[in-house]
Regions:
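Nucleotide-state-sensitive switch-loop elements of NTP-binding domains
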Residues: 39-83
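Structural beta-sheet core signal
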Residues: 34-35, 87, 110, 140-142
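Inter-motif core of Ras-like GTPase G domains
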Residues: 96-116
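Walker A/P-loop phosphate-binding motif and the immediately C-terminal alpha-helix
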Residues: 2-37
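Conserved C-terminal guanine-recognition region of P-loop GTPase G domains, centered on the G4
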Residues: 120-138
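NTP-binding/hydrolysis catalytic cores, primarily Walker-type P-loop NTPases
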Residues: 185-207
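Switch II (G3) loop of P-loop NTPases
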Residues: 78-98
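Beta-strand-loop-alpha "switch" segments that mediate conformational coupling across diverse proteins
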Residues: 144-149, 155-187
């Protein structure tokens, strides 16, 4: 099963969400997970290498790769039915290397925030994705939501995105998210992360 984490807008929280989901699938569900870091900043791969210096056996592997390399490495990543491959995509849409990745996706998770630019980028990402892979399920994760801010567009945004896919419970804006690693999710944010992921696990993970 190939799961993409993506949005056209950089800084949407793709890499952190990828780590949160990987930790959830391994620690909560006991699944076999491999993370492929295709983001240009390679922040997930860098965290993985740093954590290996401090911890013992890693709970899952992280592989740094480019979009162009995907057709060559796909068969090695998905070597058995129960294998979960999480791909952290670059924050862009103008690369033909995305086509093969989009075509292979079984599920796409899209973090977004409640501002106009993020919403427009999220819609554009979704439209392009669906032109390439019309049947792939989409899951939208409201990210970095501030508790003391009234988002006037929230209801409208949720309604529009719900026409395209599932909108999960929101992830709050907390400093603890900066401490997520390839080995653990901080306890302070673990419940909210689990709540978001449980909202779509049963429907989309037919393992």
């Amino acid at each position: 099963m190939i799961i993409l984490t993506g949005n056209q807008k950089g800084g949407a929280g793709k890499s952190t969400l990828t780590l949160l989901l990987a930790n959830y699938l391994v620690q909560e569900k006991g699944l076999d997970v491999t993370v492929v870091d295709m983001d240009y900043q390679q922040s997930v791969a860098q965290k993985f290498e740093r954590a290996k210096l401090l911890e013992n056996a890693e709970p899952y592997q992280v592989v740094a790769a480019s979009l162009e390399s995907f057709p060559d490495i796909r068969h090695m990543l998905c070597n058995h039915k129960e294998q979960i491959v999480l791909i952290d995509l670059p924050g862009k849409l103008d690369d033909d290397g995305l086509i093969a990745v989009f075509e292979s996706a079984d599920l796409v998770i899209c973090p977004f925030s409640y501002d106009e630019f993020s919403f427009e980028s999220t819609i554009l990402f979704s439209v392009v994705l669906r032109k390439i892979n019309a049947q792939v399920p989409l899951v939208y994760v409201p990210n970095r939501v501030k508790a003391n801010v009234r988002y006037e567009t929230k209801v409208e945004v949720d309604e529009q995105l719900a026409l395209l896919g599932l909108v999960t419970p929101a992830l709050p804006d907390r400093v603890d998210f900066q401490r997520v690693s390839t080995f653990q999710t901080p306890l302070a944010i673990y419940p909210v992360a689990v709540n978001a992921f449980e909202s779509f696990y049963e429907k989309h993970f037919n393992l």
